[in-house]
Amino acid sequence: MRLRHAWLVLLLIALGTTDADAQRRRRSMGGQRYNANGVFGLGLELGAPTGLNGKYFLSSDRALNFGIGVIYDRYYYDRRDGLHLYLDYLFHPFSLTNNPTFQLPFYVGFGGRIWDFDDYRGRDRYDDGYALGARVPLGLAFDFNNVPLDIFVQLTFVVDFFFAYEDRAGIHLEGSFGIRYWFD
């Protein structure tokens, strides 16, 4: 229920923002095929992980993407859940479409993550551990030109190195989507 309220608040903020606010945040940093509409955005991400997401543009087509949240993983009868922190460096090489209402940039990047989790076997808590991982996110961002919002869809390839009771590596494919409000 709280999640619905959060989405409703973000929607009301977006609808209450004028076109002048959106135009004020527009900028161009050169002749790139994709030019970011804002510098710093903050929002919600759902999927793997679920939590807060932020994006900070270093130039018109390069950004830092970061987040904090929880992630839930199930492998046969075992499951892991816990705190997830990540940081990615993103490239936005091109936009699939540029029209007056929105841009649709493709992005790819690389980064890392820390995952502090509890491990469960059946109904019993088995142990806790952590993983350090390398990430390669691929995604699309629906970057609206007239309101300071973007909606993103992302697939991330992850290689985790697990530490604690069992040292090993694992490969994952994770998906998420979310919405961000741009402050400038």
Regions found by a protein language model. Give the residues of each.
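Outer-membrane beta-barrel domain signature
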Residues: 50, 68-69, 75-76, 124, ...
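Gram-negative (and chloroplast) outer-membrane scaffold detector with strong preference
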Residues: 56-151
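Residues that define the transmembrane beta-barrel architecture of outer-membrane proteins
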Residues: 36-38, 46-50, 79-85, 104, ...
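Short, aromatic- and cysteine-enriched interfacial helices/patches
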Residues: 24, 94-96, 159
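Predominantly the C-terminal beta-signal and adjacent terminal strand-loop region
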Residues: 145-184
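Glycine-centered flexibility sites
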Residues: 43, 47, 51, 109-111, ...
